[in-house]
């Protein structure tokens, strides 16, 4: 076996390859793209927005039960990209951690602490042989009492960070470069601008004009810090506004 080849090293999650890589963790990042979806999160002046594609794989499915947006606490929501079952498991764990925090300390968990906690748990999955990393990426949004709107993302390796805008999924690279250009020009977006930037980003990189039933939008604003998912009618209003501007 040549030293450069990866044979034998991707069997075990806890073994470094000679190049110093953990192959199983790298494969987990590839698994995020298995779902074939892309998600985008953008932070505005007084709001944070998450947008993701909504694909109903089967004509017989009830489309109202297909979602990638989850409410973790009253004020924190997330978008999950990647393997659906892993995503649900991570959301369940996040809800447990948030409830536990509230019980212990008597106040709601801040977004960054929740993201840190989930990232810490993911990191343990990369260390133990009997566990497998989750093939999903979580982007959290919420309004912090001191910092204002927050967007946090954590990945299967246990890395987490706050963002002005970020993306996950198949077209992550394209979305990121689109958002970088947008953020460079201007950053203090109003609520409408934030939602529309996120939708434009998604429709540009995927080069499709969305119908309201094909995307999901989750928002938190400073005026109304409760996480809520926009209805199709509200999404339609934003899409119409975008179409008129073009």
Swiss-Prot record:
PROSITE patterns: PROTEASOME_ALPHA_1 (PS00388), PROTEASOME_ALPHA_2 (PS51475). This is Proteasome subunit alpha type-6. Its main location: cytoplasm. The modification N6-acetyllysine is found at residues 102, 104. Keywords: Acetylation, Cytoplasm, Glycoprotein, Nucleus, Phosphoprotein, Proteasome. Belongs to the peptidase T1A family. One of its GO terms (molecular function) is RNA binding.
């Amino acid at each position: 076996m040549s030293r450069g080849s990866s044979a034998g090293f991707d069997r075990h999650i806890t073994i470094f390859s000679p190049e110093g890589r953990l192959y199983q963790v790298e494969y987990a990042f590839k698994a995020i793209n298995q779902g074939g979806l892309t998600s985008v999160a953008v932070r505005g002046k007084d709001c944070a927005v998450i947008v993701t594609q909504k694909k109903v794989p089967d004509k017989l499915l009830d489309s109202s039960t297909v979602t990638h947006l989850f409410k973790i606490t009253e004020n924190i929501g997330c978008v999950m990209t990647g393997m659906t079952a892993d995503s649900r498991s991570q959301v369940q764990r996040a809800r447990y951690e948030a409830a536990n925090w509230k019980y212990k300390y008597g106040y709601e968990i801040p977004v960054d602490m929740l993201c840190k906690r989930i990232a810490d748990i993911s990191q343990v999955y990369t260390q133990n042989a009997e566990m497998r990393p989750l093939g999903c990426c979580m982007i959290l949004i919420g309004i912090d009492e001191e910092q204002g709107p927050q967007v946090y993302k954590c990945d299967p390796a246990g890395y987490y960070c706050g963002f002005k805008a970020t993306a996950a999924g198949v077209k992550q690279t394209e979305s990121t470069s689109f958002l970088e250009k947008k953020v460079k020009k201007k950053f203090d977006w109003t609520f409408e601008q934030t939602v529309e930037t996120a939708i434009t980003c998604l429709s540009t990189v995927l080069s499709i004009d969305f119908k309201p039933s094909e995307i999901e939008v989750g928002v938190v604003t400073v005026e109304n810090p409760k996480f809520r998912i926009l209805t199709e009618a509200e999404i339609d209003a934003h899409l119409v506004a975008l179409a008129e501007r073009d």
